[in-house]
Amino acid sequence: MNEKSLRVLEYFKIKDGIKKYISTSAAKKLIDELEPYGSLYEVKEHIEETKEAFELLMKKGAPPFEGAYDVTEAVSMAEKGFSLAPGQLLKVGSMLRCARKFKEYISHKEEEESYRIIEDICSGIIPLKNIEDNIFNAIIGEEEISDKASTALYSIRRSLKDKNASIKDKVNAMMRSYSKYLQENLYTIRGERYVIPVKAEYKAQVPGLVHDQSSTGATLFIEPMGLVNLNNEIKELMLKEKAEIERILRELSALIYKSIVAVKNNEKIVTELDFIFAKAKYASSINATAPHVNDKGVIDIVMGRHPLIDPAKVVPLNIYMGREFTSLVITGPNTGGKTVTLKTTGLLEVMAMSGLMIPARENSTISFFKEVYADIGDEQSIEQSLSTFSSHMTNIVRIIDDADEDSLVLFDELGAGTDPTEGAALAISILEALRKRGTKIVATTHYSELKAYALKTENVENASVEFDVETLRPTYRLLIGIPGKSNAFEISKRLGLSDYIIEEARKGISKDTLEFEDLIQNLQTRSVKAEENLRKAEFLKEQAEKFKEKYEEKVSSITETREKALHEGRREAKKIIEEAKSEADKILKDMREMERLGYSSEARQRLQESRQKLKEKLNNAEESLNISERDQGEALKSVKEGEEVFIPSLNMKGIVISTQDSKGEVGIQAGIMKINVKLKDLRKTNNNPISKKEKAVKKREARLNLKSVAQSIDLRGLDSEEAIYKTDIYLDEAYMAGLGSVTVIHGKGTGVLRNAINTMLKKNSHVKSYRLGNFGEGGTGVTVVELK
């Protein structure tokens, strides 16, 4: 794609906007290299990957990029066999953890929606938890190694601690004995050796080694001879500690070296995911959608918005071309929004061709072009001494030389900057030359001659930007099919120009021209009314949709309540039946006891008959319950449009409005609801409804499957009581969603909130274990909870 067009369309500002959402500098490099792709397949795939990331953001919240660092340099050093610093190792460990957690982030149940491209990328991740654990167990901070890094280091540091305690006791004793010679009763350390501050005039009274003196020379820092051996022992231990730390770092670096291919692979994937999710986050910030893409030259942008204009001020744009016409000529007065229309169209095109979602309504369509050429604005060069006209013409000549049927050309004020008659004629010739090649064109102009050209030329359509004569302001709405009108007379009249002057001016214009302008005015008025009617219709449609949603919610609520009541009733009935059976068995036992004690067999016979009748009634009642729960009706092997079917999960009948699709789903009109139901879940209408119990279970399963739970909860700003309440609910949802571990963000602060949360976690039945966050996870500001 030619850089000039990208520059005038302000494409690079879009890339700057995306960079705000990256986590690694390696991903920033990918954004710097981003440009429109060279094939339809690439464009579709990259839009789809952005859309998948966007949907994951909406469903699962922020991806696990905490602690995702650019480790390119560290990995390169490890590959060459160098020993890495603690900070570098921590960053590599964080990157590996980020990669592993991404596999958990995209995991889903079999029946839930899959994300083909993102899952395919993540399938290449090779979890290296062993390396992660070794790094995080050994290294606490960028300059701090854990005592647990090795048994040798633990032993050395324990010895150091003991030696330091011994030397402190000894130096304190010496200070007491030398107190009258000291500047102050405080020991200090110089060159990693314990020393005491002796007044210069008493240095002979304290035998030892002089290590330093104060700035005034009044104090000498002396290491008493009695401390020399202990200081030497401490120095030896410190050297051993340093050597052991270097050995540990070499060992950890060697672990990375052994798995360098997998480490580099994971680093590359994390960088790619960072890039993809940055695109998705930017899409969310501009309220973007994924457009359809074709290679037929068809553009249909619905309510498109320029992403760099303030959302509160931007006017949505509707523009289409490529079916009935391939060239669009936008005419009308200056400052009417023609250039914004041109830039919006071009920018949304190159955004989509770069795999980005665009700020427009769902189902907008963008065409793939091999090149987008733009001649917009005044980019004349002072050094080249080019006039406005010459500057534009130089660019236009280049466009005419290169543009073909797979190109989109955007002209702003074509033919301007020279004599109007010649400029208009030249503009028509340029448009006609490109049109004959099949080039797709959007051009703006204020020449009336181009209106006539568009009216009489095949595949060329007029358009204008609406102007409100009442307020003397443009509305910036594009009216396709209606040429622009200058409105000079109306504007002049409203600004106070005398009527007789305006009438004299009218006489200077031909009757045909005036009639044509009046026709344009009438068309614009009708278009405005049509727009108003359309907006009213859309408003009514939205209201109807809201009413439908409320109705469905009420129906669902009523159905759920009814099912719950029926389920409870059946459960209670079963309980009564079981109790009655137990009572009947007790009666029989009593009868046998009576017979044993000598009561007549006749009495026993009557009791036996009574018991049998009771048992039969109970069995009949139980069987009727079981039948109603068991009998769901006969399954359907196929359906046809217009057929009446029964939907057990809703306990409703419906009419088939579309037959089975590739997913095995059938379109059903059930009351006012239009729903898709799996064919296997439909029954013939002459069968009994599904049991309320099973229906309730299915609804619960559906709700669980649809519900998404974030990987973390943020409690900052809440008091302890509210935080505990929210965390308790969140842990229930996370457990039901099958999450393995979650993060509770409570902040560092005074520790009150953290302690309250930890106390609650000890008692929660879903919690297997919990710990404070490691480096890159949030440290003591978060608690990582592992669920059962």
UniProtKB/Swiss-Prot annotation:
<dbReference type="GO" id="GO:0043023">
    <property type="term" value="F:ribosomal large subunit binding"/>
</dbReference>
<dbReference type="GO" id="GO:0072344">
    <property type="term" value="P:rescue of stalled ribosome"/>
</dbReference>
<keyword id="KW-0540">Nuclease</keyword>
<comment type="similarity">
    <text>Belongs to the DNA mismatch repair MutS family. MutS2 subfamily.</text>
</comment>
<keyword id="KW-0255">Endonuclease</keyword>
<keyword id="KW-0699">rRNA-binding</keyword>
<dbReference type="InterPro" id="IPR027417">
    <property type="entry name" value="P-loop_NTPase"/>
</dbReference>
<dbReference type="GO" id="GO:0030983">
    <property type="term" value="F:mismatched DNA binding"/>
</dbReference>
<keyword id="KW-0067">ATP-binding</keyword>
<dbReference type="InterPro" id="IPR000432">
    <property type="entry name" value="DNA_mismatch_repair_MutS_C"/>
</dbReference>
<comment type="function">
    <text>Acts as a ribosome collision sensor, splitting the ribosome into its 2 subunits. Detects stalled/collided 70S ribosomes which it binds and splits by an ATP-hydrolysis driven conformational change. Acts upstream of the ribosome quality control system (RQC), a ribosome-associated complex that mediates the extraction of incompletely synthesized nascent chains from stalled ribosomes and their subsequent degradation. Probably generates substrates for RQC.</text>
</comment>
<dbReference type="InterPro" id="IPR002625">
    <property type="entry name" value="Smr_dom"/>
</dbReference>
<feature type="binding site">
    <location>
        <begin position="332"/>
        <end position="339"/>
    </location>
    <ligand>
        <name>ATP</name>
    </ligand>
</feature>
<dbReference type="GO" id="GO:0016887">
    <property type="term" value="F:ATP hydrolysis activity"/>
</dbReference>
<dbReference type="GO" id="GO:0004519">
    <property type="term" value="F:endonuclease activity"/>
</dbReference>
<dbReference type="Pfam" id="PF00488">
    <property type="entry name" value="MutS_V"/>
</dbReference>
<protein>
    <recommendedName>
        <fullName>Endonuclease MutS2</fullName>
        <ecNumber>3.1.-.-</ecNumber>
        <ecNumber>3.6.4.-</ecNumber>
    </recommendedName>
</protein>
<keyword id="KW-0547">Nucleotide-binding</keyword>
<dbReference type="InterPro" id="IPR005747">
    <property type="entry name" value="MutS2"/>
</dbReference>
<dbReference type="GO" id="GO:0019843">
    <property type="term" value="F:rRNA binding"/>
</dbReference>
<comment type="subunit">
    <text>Homodimer. Binds to stalled ribosomes, contacting rRNA.</text>
</comment>
<dbReference type="InterPro" id="IPR036187">
    <property type="entry name" value="DNA_mismatch_repair_MutS_sf"/>
</dbReference>
<keyword id="KW-0378">Hydrolase</keyword>
<dbReference type="GO" id="GO:0045910">
    <property type="term" value="P:negative regulation of DNA recombination"/>
</dbReference>
<dbReference type="InterPro" id="IPR007696">
    <property type="entry name" value="DNA_mismatch_repair_MutS_core"/>
</dbReference>
<keyword id="KW-0238">DNA-binding</keyword>
<comment type="function">
    <text>Endonuclease that is involved in the suppression of homologous recombination and thus may have a key role in the control of bacterial genetic diversity.</text>
</comment>
<dbReference type="InterPro" id="IPR045076">
    <property type="entry name" value="MutS"/>
</dbReference>
<keyword id="KW-0694">RNA-binding</keyword>
<dbReference type="InterPro" id="IPR046893">
    <property type="entry name" value="MSSS"/>
</dbReference>
<dbReference type="GO" id="GO:0006298">
    <property type="term" value="P:mismatch repair"/>
</dbReference>
<dbReference type="GO" id="GO:0140664">
    <property type="term" value="F:ATP-dependent DNA damage sensor activity"/>
</dbReference>
<dbReference type="Pfam" id="PF01713">
    <property type="entry name" value="Smr"/>
</dbReference>
<dbReference type="GO" id="GO:0005524">
    <property type="term" value="F:ATP binding"/>
</dbReference>
<dbReference type="Pfam" id="PF20297">
    <property type="entry name" value="MSSS"/>
</dbReference>
<feature type="domain" description="Smr">
    <location>
        <begin position="713"/>
        <end position="788"/>
    </location>
</feature>
<dbReference type="InterPro" id="IPR036063">
    <property type="entry name" value="Smr_dom_sf"/>
</dbReference>
